[in-house]
Amino acid sequence: MLSPKRVKFRKRQRGRLKGTDERGSSVSFGEFGLKAVTSGRLTARQIEAARITINRQVKRGGKLWIRIFPHTPITKKPAETRMGKGKGNPEFWIAEIRPGRILFEMSGIDEETAEKALSLASYKLPIHTEFVKRSAL
């Protein structure tokens, strides 16, 4: 699963996801993409589950780019622990997603297969997404 090799700070505050994503909002590498419509937090496990689903659909054909990375730690206190006594230990990693962000990109396959694969992958994610094509510039 995806996780950073090193981080400057082990623990982070939660914060809020306001606004839309300007960076990473266009299909850059492939021909087709999966774009976030709502904001949310994707765990490394959810990203991996979507990746496996896409790869199962396209089999050997095509290339896949994962345009997001989980570099925010989420902490958790042990079960049956009283309140207080500091912040819990990092349990897993998340990627904070705003509307407009491209999550996955694909190329080397036909549009119908790409749309089916990305649609099935979207069921594994806790946010609403849409299928997008590269705009002809």
Swiss-Prot record:
Keyword annotations: Ribonucleoprotein, Ribosomal protein, RNA-binding, rRNA-binding, tRNA-binding
Function: Binds 23S rRNA and is also seen to make contacts with the A and possibly P site tRNAs.
A cellular-component GO term for this protein: cytosolic large ribosomal subunit
Gene label: rplP
Name the record gives this protein: Large ribosomal subunit protein uL16
Oligomer and partners: Part of the 50S ribosomal subunit.
Organism: Leptospira borgpetersenii serovar Hardjo-bovis (strain JB197)
InterPro entries linked: Ribosomal_uL16 (IPR047873), Ribosomal_uL16_bact-type (IPR000114), Ribosomal_uL16_CS (IPR020798), Ribosomal_uL16_dom (IPR016180), Ribosomal_uL16_sf (IPR036920)
CDD domains: Ribosomal_L16_L10e
HAMAP family for the chain: Ribosomal_uL16
